[in-house]
Amino acid sequence: MKKYIVPMKKLLFTALMISAFSACTTDTDTNENIVVDPVAVATCSDGIQNGDETGVDCGGSCSSCDIELEGTLSQNLTLDSENNYSLTGALIVPNGITLTIPAGVTIKATRGTSAYIAIAQGGKLNVYGTAQEPVIMTSGAADPQAGDWGGLVICGKAPTNVGVSATSEVADLTYGGTDINDNSGTIQYLRVEYTGATYTNEKEFNGVSLFGVGAGTIFQYVQSFEAGDDGIEFFGGTVNGNYLVSVGSGDDSIDFADGWNGSGSYWYITQGAKAGIEGSNNGDNGDATPVTQVSLSNISVVGPVSEGALYYKEGGGIFQIDNLFVAALDDQVIKVKSTDSEAQTRLNNGSLTITNLTGATDKASLSTGFDFTNYENISLSTEGLGAGAGAAYPEWAAGWSRQ
């Protein structure tokens, strides 16, 4: 709403005239009781647009006005750390378009399932945060909490075992294909907070969801904080994920499924409600191909958790894990459902290898829900530090992430 604006030059002129008028009066003036109304001075908290403001109490000499983000981009967009951004609905980055977010940008989302950021196949997201100035995507609520808004969804063209043209669980975007090296951009030093808005009990956002994202994508130094569902989840694809943090997820902390063929190093996981890591092949067909195959190293999982440091489910896959540190788990290192025959078969055939497992008391108590008999590929250690500092917060996570 446009309000009456008094230019600063006019304010100064008026003040000078009042001063001059006062100086010219004498004791004999008959108008000595004249009262001159004071000139209103614009402030940044008076609830109206005035002075040099470009909005109500914002812009000009005041703090920057919020810029609303919503809709499907039609051209490349680069944000500016000097601005305030409000995510008021779905922001879609379509094929051929790039969204670039430099260091220090914060995006605050309105509450509900309609507020999320989605990168479609062929679109790109470049997040150029730094350890000192991360990019933050968070809730705009005065009392933020898990599940406030959607989250970040990225869809690529890399292989999955659910088909070459699947539809994402949220945002209804196509993903999957045959391009192993598909590139969805560069994402580094990103913190995503209070995500996980719920559609139904079976459909809700994660902090970051990567659907068929390819190995040409850089995904590192990313944190999910207080997600209502999973923190970070890989749905197939070939992208690698390094230096990942999940704190306070409402479900699994880091999840991968649907034929993810990638690697991850330096993951710090704590305060998750269910599994530290959930690794599965395919919920409808445990033998689907390509089989989930991952190589992980330098991992810390700090409990308590209700479904183990690793929940090996729905056919599991071929997992190689080195330097796994676990704490506060009550020996819940590996969980397998008693009815998951494909996962059980793979486990006893040696498809899970864990070297330098620190924090477990003995091999016989590693698994819950299943009598695990093949321990040849699991070696215990007393010296591993997992993500770098054992159960403590790692040094590489300082500054840009939060505990």
Question: Positions of the model-derived regions?
Answer:
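Catalytic metal-binding/acid-base residues of hydrolase active sites
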Residues: 106
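Bacterial N-terminal signal peptides that target proteins for export
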Residues: 2-12
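Disulfide-bonded cysteine-rich modules in secreted/extracellular proteins
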Residues: 41-50, 67-75
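Bacterial Sec-dependent N-terminal signal peptides
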Residues: 4, 16-47, 55, 59, ...
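Extracellular beta-rich repeat passengers
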Residues: 69-80, 87-94, 98-99, 110-122, ...
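Glycine-rich loop(s) and the adjacent beta-strand/alpha-helix scaffold that form part
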Residues: 133-134
